[in-house]
Amino acid sequence: MKNNKFALLAIICVFSIQSFAQKKSKKDDLVTIKTEQGTMHVILFDETPKHKANFIKLVKDKFYDGLLFHRVIEGFMIQGGDPESRDAKADVTLGKGENGYRVPAEFSPKLFHQKGALAAARDNNPAKESSGCQFYIVQGKKWNKADLAKQVARATRKVTEEQKAVYETVGGTPHLDGSYTVFGQVVDGVDVIDKITSYPRNDRDRPEKNIAMKVSVKKMKKKKITKKYHWNYQS
């Protein structure tokens, strides 16, 4: 555990040295998550540098290749990243596997659980530190004003009017805001989430069909990302 903590610290330090230059960089990291159900493209937020650096490191190390989306709940999210899920037998309960460290929580009022949000899973710890490897992607649902008000009341931080509008028109899981770190967003292939959540699952929410992933990352010009995926970078 101690060695793993030093490894995470090294990742964070390297990222911190580069962070100023990256803010002015004309390129960004584009993550590709491939499954039999389709491909998702994801951008990672500079507002969550520890999570971004950690995720990119794991992707480059091919940590996620062959792992499963082991927990799938329609109208909520798809979860993966458990290292014990690789080649796991159908009757095995998954979700407890870790890589030996946590990532400190990184909350930003600009980042929220809209549909397609990439967020870090975690256990029940008071600091809300994230799993070092497990993540989920939000499906959620669209909310009417009355039900949304109840959901927002459960959130541990203020949800803005602009964010409420997104929850009403695009969908998401507003009650998780302020409790789990959102560190990325699916910018292409959101329909893949719906395909994955449509699969039958057992009483532990594991899909009856194994849904494996292959994850890669590459640098791409921000202008190209904006043009191809309609993602607008804020200055």
Each model region followed by its residue ranges:
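Bacterial Sec-dependent N-terminal signal peptides
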Residues: M1-S25
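Cyclophilin-like peptidyl-prolyl cis-trans isomerases
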Residues: S19-S235
